[in-house]
């Protein structure tokens, strides 16, 4: 759709002059360059317009004065056709503007198949970002599993300390993307740099704190987590945790830099950094564990080095965009309040997920070394598979706000877009669920050679598939709730899911259902999230049907 300026002629008449002014004056207007958001970046794309803008004089015009705004060819000028020069009228000021052509590529105007094609193309690079982290853990699991079942079991509680705790700092990622994107929309580069510097400082402070806490209390936390019955796996797990803990500052700073790039609509830079990091981790695991025999310590060193390299590459990518990624700024109390107030609902949501998966590992840990090892393998494959649905949540958060709160608000089109996301999510769930189930069922030797561990893995195949297949659709629904700023509901519903599923997990584990009971509790957790999100979106009071946006307006403004 091409949008161009048209000639506009209007007459200003019968406007009384202000008697307090020393002279009657003409009305001089400033040319207006409309901004139409494209679906990709919600900003005008194309060459920058060069405007010579005159000042807008808020005085009165003389009687029967006609103004013409001419814009036939894209250059606009304002001229005075009739006026009384003897009365001291200000001579017209010519305004020349090179008005750019705005190409509107609106996702909402496409057919449902066209929408799905665009969504798939958009989520490609984003999928890579979500895959690299779980891929590193999966590589560690596969390499360590070939050497020792004891170290494979130790990897379970160790990854809880190293990986799951990282997700509690997801609020840094959300706050960075939101604040950077908002500052860019204002075209204020200094404000963008200030926001990045503040969040880099917060990331550094949190990272150093976690590194110190890991060093001081890592062994105690692992002992309390695994229990007395599994004290034999604590030394190996602690070795892994202490080495990985050295990378805490780099991990959180890297998250801030990655999210800043995403806020600038750049997903390829972070993807390249994480691809290099994954390659370093894979090669390091093979060399240090397989050839040099360092075992779980070698896997930890390979992962730690890869995380530091990834953080440096992401910061370097920011520097190439003209921002200083090595500039840190201490935030004021009001700025801290803004950041944490914005990210609090997401923090609660992520904490609920982390706590439930931590409970899964906790109850599995009490069932013996072989069951811990089997659970570790299945959980790593599950995590690797579920991230394929995360880009659907990101897509909803990118494209839904314009249809829900934008100038061209259109709830029917928003519902059609959600339908496209759910269809893709359901299809992706079946495909990923089938492939993700086939790998541990047909090729368990990739992860372990222990027949007992393999047997325990096969016992949870059915609940594993049921939990995995619904996850992508759940992500698309929750992403829509986040886009609609229905933050209170999503945080409360996730907390409720945690409470009910946690109780079910405890009952099934203590009732003698073993590892299978743990995974059926996960099925209940995932399907409850899907059902509650779907119910809210189909409700007449939900963001897709309610015409009253006053409940969400303040949240959108604050964000």
Curated annotation (Swiss-Prot):
Family: Belongs to the multi antimicrobial extrusion (MATE) (TC 2.A.66.1) family.
Transit peptide: 1-60
Subcellular location: Plastid, Chloroplast membrane
Stated name of the protein: Protein DETOXIFICATION 46, chloroplastic
Keyword list, A-Z: Chloroplast, Membrane, Plastid, Transit peptide, Transmembrane, Transmembrane helix, Transport
CC per GO annotation: chloroplast; chloroplast envelope; chloroplast membrane
Pfam families membership: MatE
Membrane topology reported for the UniProt record: Multi-pass membrane protein
Matches recorded under PANTHER family: PROTEIN DETOXIFICATION 44, CHLOROPLASTIC-RELATED, PROTEIN DETOXIFICATION 46, CHLOROPLASTIC
GO molecular function: antiporter activity; xenobiotic transmembrane transporter activity
InterPro entries: DinF-like, MATE_fam
Listed transmembrane segments: 119-139, 152-172, 198-218, 245-265, 273-293, 295-315, 336-356, 359-379, 423-443, 460-480, 489-509, 519-539
Superkingdom: Eukaryota
Reported tissue expression: Constitutively expressed in all green tissues.
């Amino acid at each position: 759709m091409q949008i161009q300026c048209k000639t506009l002629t209007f007459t200003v008449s019968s406007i009384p002059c202000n008697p307090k002014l020393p002279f009657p004056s003409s009305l001089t207007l400033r040319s207006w360059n409309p901004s139409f958001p494209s679906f990709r970046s919600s900003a005008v794309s194309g060459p920058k317009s060069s405007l010579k803008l005159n000042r807008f004089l808020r005085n009165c015009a003389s009687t029967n004065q006609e103004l013409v705004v001419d814009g036939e060819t894209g250059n606009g000028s304002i001229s005075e056709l009739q006026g009384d020069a003897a009365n001291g009228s200000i001579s017209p000021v010519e305004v020349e503007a090179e008005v750019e052509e705005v190409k509107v590529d609106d996702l909402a105007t496409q057919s449902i198949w066209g929408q799905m094609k665009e969504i798939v193309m958009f989520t490609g690079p984003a999928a890579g970002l979500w895959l690299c982290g779980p891929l590193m853990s999966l590589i560690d699991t596969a390499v360590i599993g070939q050497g020792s079942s004891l170290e494979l079991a130790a990897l379970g509680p160790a990854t809880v300390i190293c990986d799951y705790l990282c997700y509690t700092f997801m609020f840094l990622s959300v706050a960075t993307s939101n604040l950077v994107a908002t500052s860019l929309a204002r075209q204020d580069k200094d404000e963008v740099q200030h926001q990045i510097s503040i969040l880099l400082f917060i990331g550094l402070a949190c990272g150093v704190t976690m590194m110190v806490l890991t060093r001081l209390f890592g062994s105690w936390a692992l002992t309390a987590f695994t229990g007395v019955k599994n004290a034999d796996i604590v030394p190996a797990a602690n070795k892994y945790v202490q080495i990985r803990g050295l990378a805490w500052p780099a991990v959180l700073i890297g998250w801030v830099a990655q999210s800043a790039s995403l806020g600038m609509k750049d997903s390829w830079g972070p993807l390249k950094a994480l691809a290099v990091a994954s390659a370093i981790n894979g090669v390091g695991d093979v060399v240090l564990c397989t050839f040099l025999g360092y075992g779980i310590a070698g896997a930890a060193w390979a992962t730690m080095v890869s995380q530091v390299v990834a953080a440096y590459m992401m910061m370097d990518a920011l520097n190439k965009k003209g921002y200083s990624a090595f500039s840190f700024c201490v935030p004021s109390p009001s700025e801290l309040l803004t950041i944490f107030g914005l990210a609090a609902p997401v923090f609660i949501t992520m904490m609920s997920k982390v706590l439930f998966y931590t409970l899964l590992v906790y109850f599995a840990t009490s069932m013996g070394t072989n069951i811990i090892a089997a659970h570790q393998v299945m959980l790593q494959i599950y995590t690797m598979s579920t991230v394929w649905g995360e880009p659907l949540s990101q897509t909803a958060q990118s494209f839904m706000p314009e249809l829900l709160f934008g100038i061209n608000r259109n709830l029917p089109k928003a519902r059609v877009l959600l339908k496209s996301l759910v269809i893709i999510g359901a299809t992706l769930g079946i495909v990923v669920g089938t492939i993700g189930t086939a790998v541990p069922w047909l090729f368990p030797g990739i992860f372990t050679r222990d027949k007992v561990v393999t047997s325990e893995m096969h016992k949870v195949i059915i609940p594993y598939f049921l939990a995995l297949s619904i996850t992508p659709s759940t992500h698309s629904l929750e992403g829509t709730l986040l886009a609609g700023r229905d933050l209170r509901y999503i945080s409360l519903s996730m907390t409720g899911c945690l409470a009910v599923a946690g109780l079910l997990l405890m009952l099934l584990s203590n009732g003698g259902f073993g590892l299978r009971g743990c995974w059926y509790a996960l099925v209940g957790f995932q399907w409850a999230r899907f059902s509650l999100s779907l119910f809210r979106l189909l409700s007449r009071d939900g963001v897709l049907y309610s015409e009253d946006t006053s409940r969400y307006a303040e949240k959108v403004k604050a964000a």
